[in-house]
């Protein structure tokens, strides 16, 4: 199963990058295998970048269905994540767009596109922040 997980960066002209293979991205996974490997390392404490654990809370709002048919749903929403690590509280916010495959017994994420609207990022971002 393919998945596309993309969080572009902002370029010098305040435009989002569009080509994750040739431009800087904040996070990019072109396959489900890469994303599953990252999640596995986080969940099994094999990620030195995630030690010590980050405590976080994510809220979503303004959920909107953009398109829907028998096997697919496209939706968008706003998110805010509060993250606490190294005695520092960070807040991340932005917009997500999902393409869900609804043809099977449970929905599967086929694409996740994240626009992070923070101007400054003080720590390394990871998939659990967005």
Regions found by a protein language model. Name each.
Residues 64-130:
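A beta-strand edge to alpha-helix "cap/lid" segment located at domain peripheries
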């Amino acid at each position: 199963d393919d998945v596309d997980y993309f969080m572009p960066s902002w370029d010098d002209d305040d435009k989002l990058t569009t080509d994750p293979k040739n431009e800087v991205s904040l996070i990019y996974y072109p396959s489900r295998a890469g994303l599953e490997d990252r999640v596995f390392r986080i969940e099994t404490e094999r990620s030195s970048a995630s030690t010590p654990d980050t405590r976080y809370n994510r809220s979503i709002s303004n959920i909107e269905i953009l398109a829907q048919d028998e096997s697919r749903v496209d939706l968008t929403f706003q998110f805010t994540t509060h993250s606490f690590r190294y005695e520092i509280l960070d807040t991340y916010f932005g917009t997500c767009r999902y393409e869900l495959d609804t043809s099977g017994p449970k929905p599967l994420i086929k694409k996740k596109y994240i626009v992070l609207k923070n101007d400054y990022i003080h720590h390394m971002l990871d998939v659990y922040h967005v």
